[in-house]
């Protein structure tokens, strides 16, 4: 197909070529662009596979029997399972968040038929019936696919209306079942089961749904939860389903599908994944593994260290607790807040640090030399208080052990070893020199590596394990508790991904209260992306129909070559090359659609800033597109929502991030001081407590301790019991609790202490109390006078 200009009035429809995919759907891509270097021309090995050459393409086409579970005549992408696209998409590393241009075009080519049918809900249902059995990749993570399935063949779905979970969408249609590859060697019981053809597992109860504008959802049937995977086709082709935490839960995942946190020490793995003896988990961690650094793997970001805690008070060695006026009181207040939120006993598992501290040697901050102090010994028989200082009893199975992936990982390319020691523990490279080196530990003193001397590592998240086996993360940046995983084995595969994609799970109120789901990010659920320019109302006319939009998205280049050339001349760009690539795509898209990028940015809430004068400029930077160094800085993006801003800060290890404000005066103050006895809490009782507090809160913001103080605010002050004494919302002098009449000087009246006012914990109950005083006659009289 001849190469087309992005400014053509109406590009011709893309030929079906290989149906739902193949290099023919890429439009003007080179013939060999979809075949990776070194990849074989055909993936089929059967003698009956007829190898033919598609006219106009340099791809060696095969005609295999189709994807697993598909009928023999199915077929828009019947060659995907044995085609070059599957080989290309199987090489995406787990640390990478976005797909490359070649992988992007492969995703768009495979999903071409679904995109063209995304006009109405009826058209999507017809497409799912016509292409039933077709296997489509999810991009990220590798090994997950969407098997196109009509709704009538989805077990347990019935007449579920997904618009109740997303009311702003005009229509949402369930079109596929999410399946994933299974390693038969990892689970011999699978074998040739009927439910696992060709090593594919479909027992997770996950379904893929599509909405208007190619909004992609993942529906969790067991939890009745709708997860927003992508807001448009551009985001789906670029990121896939890698941000969906629920995908990483299945314990039948094959080796490296996706790769989990590597715990090569069998003793530590058995300690963390022990289900029947979970009460002794905390004692075992304190006795043997306190201070051990685990290289935590989170999909879509770099490795980061997680230091296993021996006691809750050890958090005083890390920021932001170390710089608090009184760290012990702040930790007590935080522990009290966690007791109120979790409504059961819990265990502080570890502190997650920024990636730059991985491999830095240090000892515990106990006043001695680094690496020479043993962790504090904990008696195996002593009784400890609940709420972070004592192990918790877990009801139910936590999960099976995660198989160790054979491939190495880490910055150096080597594996990792974790050797217990009487002094400290480590995670170091698996080469001979590293194996012979002494073990190290990440602490708060004597830091080595990229950090300056005297600096203290910052705890970005504190991993918690509640009494029911669920894993939560306490974020010291904003003081909230976020769900991370349903069990420990799930956490070792998903890492802290649950805190990086906040506000993307919609569930009924009872389910959200049970799992402590955060509030929905209305910006993501109710508005399109501001940089999805192919959906802009002022875009060119040819980009308003499906064929034109697909040709626009899959056109080659999109300004990335210029950025890569510019990065070779300016090494400073390499640190944030993904941001510059995204800006280059925006500029190229705006030029192809005839839009002014500066106007679009300002309409969305951002502005173009001049590098020298720092004043808004409406002129678009054209020098970057010519390969020259720009005298303008990158266009500032529109202001992010608090949840999106926090997720970006956690993903990029932004240690300077601060919340915008403290909890307001109308926030809900929890007066619950109940002491939860470990091992005596039933699951239904815990869920009932969480639901009751959610009803009492009535959607108000939670009054909570804030370890990270916003700019221009005073630090919060707490008593030894964790009760806040005074707020820090402003720089103005606050009320000290001393009361005196305004017409009498304080010299003649002794000061009288007035305790600070406590907000009423239950606004709904207060309203009911006030309504009891209103009789029917008063209401009738009030209505009569208003009517007059």
Swiss-Prot record:
Changing residue 130 to A: 25% loss of viral replication. Changing residue 163 to A: 15% loss of viral replication. Residues 650-659 have a biased composition (Basic and acidic residues). One of its GO terms (molecular function) is protein serine/threonine kinase inhibitor activity. Its main location: virion. InterPro entries: US22-like (IPR003360). It holds the Pfam family US22. Residues 74-248 are annotated as: RNA-binding. Residues 1-82, 366-385, 609-663 are annotated as: Disordered. It comes from the Viruses. It is found in: Virion; Host cytoplasm; Host nucleus. Residues 16-25 have a biased composition (Gly residues). Residues 671-788 are annotated as: Interaction with host EIF2AK2/PKR. GO terms for cellular component: host cell cytoplasm; host cell nucleus; virion component. Keywords: Host cytoplasm, Host nucleus, Host-virus interaction, Inhibition of host autophagy by virus, Inhibition of host innate immune response by virus, Inhibition of host interferon signaling pathway by virus, Inhibition of host PKR by virus, Interferon antiviral system evasion, Viral immunoevasion, Virion. Residues 26-56 have a biased composition (Low complexity). GO terms for biological process: symbiont-mediated suppression of host autophagy; symbiont-mediated suppression of host innate immune response; symbiont-mediated suppression of host PKR/eIFalpha signaling; symbiont-mediated suppression of host type I interferon-mediated signaling pathway. Interacts with host EIF2AK2/PKR; this interaction retains EIF2AK2 to the host nucleus and prevents its activation. Interaction (via N-terminus) with host BECN1; this interaction inhibits host autophagy. Interacts with the viral DNA polymerase accessory subunit UL44. Interacts with host HSPA5. The N-terminus binds RNA. The C-terminus is required to bind and antagonize host EIF2AK2/PKR. Inhibits the establishment of the antiviral state and the integrated stress response (ISR) in the infected cell. Prevents the phosphorylation of the host eukaryotic translation initiation factor eIF-2alpha/EIF2S1 and thus the shutoff of viral and cellular protein synthesis by directly interacting with EIF2AK2/PKR. Prevents stress granule formation in response to eIF-2alpha/EIF2S1 phosphorylation, thereby rescuing viral replication and protein synthesis. Also inhibits host autophagy by interacting with host Beclin-1/BECN1. This is Protein HHLF1. It comes from Human cytomegalovirus (strain AD169) (HHV-5). The lineage of its organism: Viruses, Duplodnaviria, Heunggongvirae, Peploviricota, Herviviricetes.
